[in-house]
Amino acid sequence: MNQKQEDFSPSVKASLKSLNISFHKTRKVVNQIRGCSYEKALMILEFMPYRACKPITQLISSAASNANHNLGLKKKNLFISEAKVDEGTTIKRFQPRAQGRAYSIHKPTCHITIGMKSKNKIQ
């Protein structure tokens, strides 16, 4: 019988809801760090010139601190196992124009979820 080996390494997640940045722009940044170690992801984000880098850096630091505090995992052993960006609600505003008209402005938001696991497996 073929049985799948289950992954028993502990994992931790952190999420950020309703970030006022387009999910297209945020997804471009998150795709660069998926699968990286904690330290490498922070280094990559530090040198990228995008506005989404700062909240993603804070979210990764929060997930690593959660893993350290709640599960006792060391930050140097963590890697990003899951990183996803979903489309949030669109905030609608109106821009006044000439002769009583109004143009609609759509301000997109996104939801970011970061999952981290330890490289060391628990048997």
From Swiss-Prot:
Keywords: Chloroplast, Plastid, Ribonucleoprotein, Ribosomal protein, RNA-binding, rRNA-binding. One of its GO terms (cellular component) is chloroplast. It holds the Pfam family Ribosomal_L22. Signal peptide: none annotated. GO terms for biological process: translation. Belongs to the universal ribosomal protein uL22 family. NCBIfam families: rplV_bact (TIGR01044). This is Large ribosomal subunit protein uL22c.
